[in-house]
Amino acid sequence: SLDAWSDLEKMVGLAGNDRVLFSLDLHQGRPVYHLDNGPRLERISPEELVDRAVSIGVAGLLVIDLADVGSAAGPSTGPLIQQLLVKYRLPLYAGGGVRDRRDVQAVLDAGARGVLIGTAVHKGFQI
């Protein structure tokens, strides 16, 4: 979690813009900002956050809807992935809710370069 955009600028400056990914954390499609006392939903659009991160010089994006994480309900980020890839030519990875090979393929078909899998592996789901 970043306290300010200047933190991301420092990270990109230190590591180089070809080595930093920006994680767009969502909850039911809305951006989430993490505070010490828990997450807060942002009133800014996902696209506005990505615009800012891209202007700072990130190398790629991770899109994850936290409402999908551990749900085994399937990923919900496909339409947003497609929308972001129309505007940005960056590597994009996505996760949350992935249950099986079909979900992996759906995320890849939406245009993601890769898929983040966690709970499905820990629970022994057949990927």
Enumerate the language-model features and the residues they cover.
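Glycine- and other small-residue-rich loops at beta-strand/loop junctions that grip anionic moieties
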Residues: 1, 64, 69, 73, ...
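Conserved anion-binding
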Residues: 1-69
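Catalytic cores of alpha/beta
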Residues: 3-11, 79-117
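Active-site catalytic pocket residues across diverse enzymes, especially alpha/beta-hydrolases
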Residues: 15, 111, 125
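Short, composition-biased local secondary-structure segments
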Residues: 19-21, 70-81
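Generic structural signal for helix capping and beta-alpha/helix-loop junctions
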Residues: 29-30, 70, 101-102, 124-125
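A short, acidic, amphipathic alpha-helical segment used as a generic capping/interface helix at domain edges
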Residues: 46-54, 77-82, 101
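Short, basic/aromatic-enriched C-terminal tail that caps enzymatic domains
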Residues: 117-127
